[in-house]
Amino acid sequence: MCAAIAAAPPVDEPGRGRDAFEKRCSGCHTLDKIKVGPPLRGVYARKAGTDPQFPYSDAMKSASVSWDDSTLDRWLADTDSVVPGNEMAFRLNDPVERANIIAYLRQLSSASKRTH
């Protein structure tokens, strides 16, 4: 029974994801404006390197990746494993924290689509 619990996928919690975003991501990202990195509101389900506000690297512009749970999880764990040669130097080892951040970004993207 303990092995089954340990093997269960992380539960995503957008509220905790917001807190993790503030702690882990806000040094370089905001939701709506360019900082060091692109704004992240609406990033979920968008093709990588396509926000018209941001001057992406050639690696990001030519990436054939769309941001979903799987690609965002791999990206947050090791950016170079998803888009080699990108300019984001970041790794987040905690799968629960990654799941929470992804849930937050997914929720923001869903809310953004409902208001437009």
Sequence positions of predicted segments:
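Short, solvent-exposed linear motifs at loop/edge-of-secondary-structure regions
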Residues: 1-3, 37-38
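Electrostatic cytochrome c docking/interface patches
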Residues: 2-21, 116
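Membrane-targeting and insertion segments and their boundary/processing signals
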Residues: 10, 42-46, 71, 75-79
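Gly/Gly-Pro-rich "capping" loops immediately C-terminal to redox-active cysteine motifs
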Residues: 14-18, 30, 34-68, 87, ...
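The canonical Cys-X-X-Cys-His
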Residues: 21-31, 101, 105
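C-terminal capping alpha-helices of c-type cytochrome domains
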Residues: 68-116
